[in-house]
Amino acid sequence: MFNLYRSSLKNLKLPNINNNIKSNLVIRSYTTNINGNIKNDDDNNKFYSLSQFPYPSGALHMGHVRVYTISDCIARLKRMQGYDVIHPMGWDAFGLPAENAAIDKQVSPSEWTNLNISSMRDQLKLLNFQFDWDRELSTCNKEYYRWTQEIFLRLLKSGLAYRKSATVNWDPIDQTVLANEQVDAQGRSWRSNAIVEKKEMKQWFYKITSMADRLTDDLDQLPGWSDEIKNMQKEWIGRSYGHLIEFQSCAQKPLSNITVFTTRAETIYGVSFLAISPHHSEINQIRANLINDEKRLELDQYLKEIQEIKNKMGTQEDVENLKTFNTGLTFYQPITKKYIPLILSNFVHADYGTGAVMGVPSHNRSDYQVAKQQNLKLLPVLGIEREQQQQQQQQQQQQQLEIEEECYDYSNTGKLINSGQDTGIEFKEFIKRLEDQQLIKRQTNYRIHDWLISRQRYWGTPIPIIVCEKCGDVPVPSDQLPVELPIDIQFTGKGNLLNQLDHWKNVKCPCCGSQATRETDTMDTFVDSSWYFLRFLDSKNSQSIFSSELVNRFMPIDVYVGGIEHAILHLLYSRFITKFLKDQQLIDHSEPFKVLLAQGLVKSPTYRDSITNKPIHPSNVEFKTIKSNESGKSQQQTINKLTGNQVSVTIEKMSKSKLNGIDPKEIIDKYGSDTLKTYILFKAPPEKSLDWDTQGIEGCKKWLTRINVSIQSFLNQFDVIEGKEQHQHQQQQHQQPLPSSEFNEQQSKEVKDILFETHLTMNKVTESIDKHSFNTGIAALMELSNTLQKSSPQIKLTKEYYQSLRALTLMLFPFSPIFSQIHWKSLIDDLPQSCKSFYSENYSSFEQQSYGNSNDNDVFNQRWPKPTPSALVRDFNSLVIQFDGKTKGVESIPTSITDFSNFVQSNSKYLNRFKDKTIDQIFIGTTKTGNSINFTFKKK
């Protein structure tokens, strides 16, 4: 184990601690499992800190390091504050990459995955994250997916899991179904890059639409979520309130009436066209009703163009890609008694609403574009304020050209215009009358679709269904779970492997005993990750999915850390499963995550050859200083060593393809894990992108080194040492502690200032971690360490200085745990025996709360320092004095003085500043150490 952590040790540079002690401390740091056995004491505060578990790709990247550093920092603080903390780690282990790797490396997906898990576990331990390793789980282990299958059966029994034939996205290369979100904007597969095809297949779904309202409404009960993420969820669910309006077919041959969903029923008189999707269910009937073969050929050509656009642009909607087709057919509208032309438009989606819309170009941007392309008339039907109407008329007169703005809504009067017999009626009255006459019907519509969970892949959770010709789809009995994946297989990657394994697929029907077959689809990996946070709380339970008692005590998760890329689907699916399990009375909570912390990307310079535009590895980049022949000035150029071409530099997300990734192990080998984690937390707020900067990590290393020097210098000053600057054999007398009874006035003030800053820092660091502004907490620690470093030699002999060093060391623990552990032990154990009674014994309860327990040299057992109220009371404050914004002095004044203006104006040092001048304004502000006052003067 020592070899695994050697890199962390050698970068600490601690001269007074031998390697054996250092090794023991670090191993203690890695293997401590504070919460191996959960206490069942309900009076004990709980805290569940969770980072999104990784896919075991084999190598950690800096994005991983950042997310786990954040959750680890929070968990360490909460443990020190006395919370019963859950901070687990596991593996989201199913999925396509394992199958692809199995093909490339000629190993089974299981073997490849388990090797990667072992490797990444070691990497995480090298980073010294304090995870509860006893809770470790992997979604590809049968002990886990047995319960994923149990959830499926419960959903099936509740009518929330079902199978139906559906048009799916088919990847012709990977031979699998893709969810919509796995198809990029160009209509290509997210992994194979193949052009995705449409295919009809029977698929399994979870009925997430049944909870669309709860999933929307309950977002308002989550103050710990950002508005950005909540809005993303709401937009994905897409709830809207409106009405259904029917348009009657006037076709000669069979053609159904078309019903539209609209949120603006009051605009019915402004309808210029009826538009449907080119993929509408009635498209064949429409084709049959076209006037002649020439028109049908035009339709076929149009549909071909639409498919080409879809393959190229996917779901992107751009005016340039708008394609419409006038069928020449009309539909009758009973409300307006008008005949409306039927248009095909690729801006209408077949799977949203009814797949048809009524076009009101006077009051809708997209409708306006269709009308413009088809040369249809605009008819405004919503009244606008008179003043705005006049402005609009003036604008039209001035420009004398068509303006697109004419189709948009203005401030409405609430009354209809140009609406026949209904002109002048208020909107609400008009809609109510249509509802009463049953001409329109209220409808709530959702953009979200049911969750397609079927995947035609081998490496996933088997769906526990047996297909029988007599009995249909039969659920596997719970006592026969798990339905295990066959592990000893030869994987080729062609088609669905499970469908080819007759010995696994062919079984007896549990109901009738007839020959039957297993369902060969496996589950979407999002199913596995939709409930893993619950299993962490009882990961070894072989009798039930989890203990409801434990889950009810520790859920919901207090802080969930992960990337913004999972802000929609993973969170939505987890919320759905949580609500279902509550309905099943397995848990008490309906929302899984109290606080979401979505961290930003980790970025670094990307170098590209200016000619080929190909990424270049940093080792092949050279920085040259070149003098210009004309000006003689020096210019720095970035050159590709391999080609001699100039290099462009951009700051982008770290990735293998861009050759701009930073290997965490290399950084740990050079700087140590503590320095890396401190840098990550200090460099940028967690929600912002972190731009990698070598100078920044060097700065963090130097800061920790300075703290080490301060602590070692304090301890060394009590030793008898050989005088280095005196005669060779002359000895310098060791120092003695300085008690408060011997302080002079200046020393008394300096000690009070140190204690004030120390206790103020306790508040600042606590607040910074609780508010996830870790950089401000580290900045406060830097200020405190600088203050201690600059203290006068005599002050460094005081008990108060020693106590401040202890507090500083304790507060470093969430950020730099190994560093904190070693220095805490040193501050407790390495004091000379003659000094221990003065510095570290007989602490009051208040002192122990602030500076730790002197009888325990293990920082893991220490409590988080709490400020003492009396230490935050100051006799003097500093007053920064400015004139016209320029600082001219800093005065130390008694806290009893509150009239700063009078104090300055009566001070002889500043009288000349006011001579022959008239004060214009006086500004009072606050500073870190007191207040500021700024006098501005009137200009003559």
From Swiss-Prot:
One of its GO terms (cellular component) is mitochondrion. It comes from the Eukaryota. Residues 724-744 are annotated as: Disordered. CDD domains: LeuRS_core (cd00812). A motif ('HIGH' region) lies at residues 54-64. ATP binds at K641. One of its GO terms (biological process) is Group I intron splicing. One of its GO terms (molecular function) is aminoacyl-tRNA deacylase activity. It catalyses: tRNA(Leu) + L-leucine + ATP = L-leucyl-tRNA(Leu) + AMP + diphosphate. A motif ('KMSKS' region) lies at residues 638-642. It is found in: Mitochondrion. Its EC number is 6.1.1.4. Its main location: mitochondrion. Keywords: Aminoacyl-tRNA synthetase, ATP-binding, Ligase, Mitochondrion, Nucleotide-binding, Protein biosynthesis, Transit peptide. It holds the Pfam family Anticodon_1. PROSITE patterns: AA_TRNA_LIGASE_I. PANTHER family: LEUCINE--TRNA LIGASE, MITOCHONDRIAL (PTHR43740:SF2), LEUCYL-TRNA SYNTHETASE (PTHR43740). Belongs to the class-I aminoacyl-tRNA synthetase family. This is Leucine--tRNA ligase, mitochondrial. It comes from Dictyostelium discoideum (Social amoeba). The gene is mleuS.
